[in-house]
């Protein structure tokens, strides 16, 4: 690194004149200055700064996966950057508590001056969602079209262009799909797994059927739920059935990618799987933190507005609550716990399989 040729002054370097002069209160324009509007603006500006940093990290991760091979050193850097995103998300979630120091009455003192501006017009947040993998076809109905109609032509074009680029979800799916399905002449992991899973599910069925703690109605419901679980297990070994369930929205990962991710989680203690497991865990936590952010945001809006519509014309709390439930990205990684078996039920990996996996995971 070269030394600075010219002296660098703190305020100039951070362009504080621009940043600290960017709080233009709408309420003051109408001679009705609201003290709390300053807090409202600063909190949202800080969110946008953090979104910019998250996108900086996320785009670097996407660039890494958008190549033919990802080496261990690169994967280490990817995991580090994803973990940084998680820490930023936690900070953003905590920041909601600062907004909650404003009372509903204080918010109403300037709210009407903001129409039709709305948080769902945050282009950086939408870029973040799309880049992670929440593209239009996976959104709730309001977001699929109505949202885009409320943007400027420039912002709409930017997001529509991003929709056509590979997301991190798609790239990770492709990376996971490169792993072999662990079937050789002397070792068939998935046959071991299927036999162990069948035995486990039979035991579960027997436990429910013979339980003295459950009523007949409860038993019927438990067995119905168990049958749904069995259907999902069966789909692991039947790609046609898997694609049918995938078309119904029960899975989003491709068949090969899901099997690879499941294998990595089953053998997460193996040194060769350490980084892939950390990657899957980090993506799971990013989705979790995003869900927490949406939920806390929805609760804050309900606290401030009740059932009023939002400034952008959405249904306010109802809209935000629905996005919390529906706009999940890496849900397959959460649901994978359904398919995990006890270590005692799994075979040891032959050395030949370890070597083969080492080649495909790079």
Swiss-Prot record:
Disulfide bonds: none annotated. Heme binds at residue 297. It is an enzyme of class 1 (oxidoreductase). Its EC number is 1.13.11.11. GO terms for biological process: L-tryptophan catabolic process to acetyl-CoA; L-tryptophan catabolic process to kynurenine. Pathway: Amino-acid degradation; L-tryptophan degradation via kynurenine pathway; L-kynurenine from L-tryptophan: step 1/2. GO terms for molecular function: heme binding; metal ion binding; tryptophan 2,3-dioxygenase activity. PANTHER family: TRYPTOPHAN 2,3-DIOXYGENASE. Heme-dependent dioxygenase that catalyzes the oxidative cleavage of the L-tryptophan (L-Trp) pyrrole ring and converts L-tryptophan to N-formyl-L-kynurenine. Catalyzes the oxidative cleavage of the indole moiety. Homotetramer. HAMAP family: T23O. This is Tryptophan 2,3-dioxygenase. It comes from Alteromonas mediterranea (strain DSM 17117 / CIP 110805 / LMG 28347 / Deep ecotype). The gene is kynA.
């Amino acid at each position: 690194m070269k030394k600075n040729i010219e002296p660098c002054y703190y305020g100039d370097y951070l362009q504080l004149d621009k940043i600290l002069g960017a709080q233009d209160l709408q309420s003051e324009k109408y001679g009705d200055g609201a003290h709390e509007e300053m807090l409202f603006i600063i909190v949202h500006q800080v969110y946008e700064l953090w979104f910019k940093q998250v996108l900086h990290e996320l785009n670097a991760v996407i660039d890494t996966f958008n190549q033919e091979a990802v080496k261990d050193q690169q994967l280490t850097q990817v995991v580090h950057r994803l973990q940084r995103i998680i820490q930023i998300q936690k900070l953003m979630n905590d920041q909601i508590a600062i907004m909650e120091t404003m009372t509903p009455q204080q918010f109403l003192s300037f709210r009407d001056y903001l129409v039709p501006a709305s948080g769902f017009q945050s282009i950086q947040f939408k870029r973040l969602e799309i880049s992670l993998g929440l593209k239009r076809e996976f959104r709730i109905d309001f977001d699929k079209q109505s949202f885009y109609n409320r943007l400027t032509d420039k912002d709409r074009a930017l997001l529509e262009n991003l929709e056509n680029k590979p997301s991190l979800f798609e790239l990770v799916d492709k990376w996971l799909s490169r792993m072999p399905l662990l079937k050789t002449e002397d070792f068939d992991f998935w046959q071991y797994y299927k036999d162990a899973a069948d035995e486990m599910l039979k035991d579960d069925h027997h436990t429910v059927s013979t339980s003295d703690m459950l009523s007949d109605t409860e038993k019927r419901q438990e067995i119905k739920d168990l049958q749904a679980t069995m259907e999902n297990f069966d789909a692991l070994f039947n790609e046609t059935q898997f694609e049918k369930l995938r078309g119904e929205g029960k899975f989003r990962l491709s068949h090969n990618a899901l099997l690879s991710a499941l294998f990595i989680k089953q053998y997460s203690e193996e040194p060769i799987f350490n980084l892939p497991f950390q990657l899957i865990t980090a993506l799971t936590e990013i989705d979790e933190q995003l869900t927490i952010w949406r939920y806390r945001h929805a609760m804050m809006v309900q606290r401030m507005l009740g059932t009023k519509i939002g400034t952008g014309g959405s249904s306010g709390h109802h809209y935000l609550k629905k996005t919390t439930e529906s706009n999940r990205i890496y849900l397959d990684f959460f649901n994978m716990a359904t398919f995990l078996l006890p270590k005692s039920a799994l075979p040891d990996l032959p050395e030949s399989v370890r070597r083969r996996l080492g080649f495909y995971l790079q």
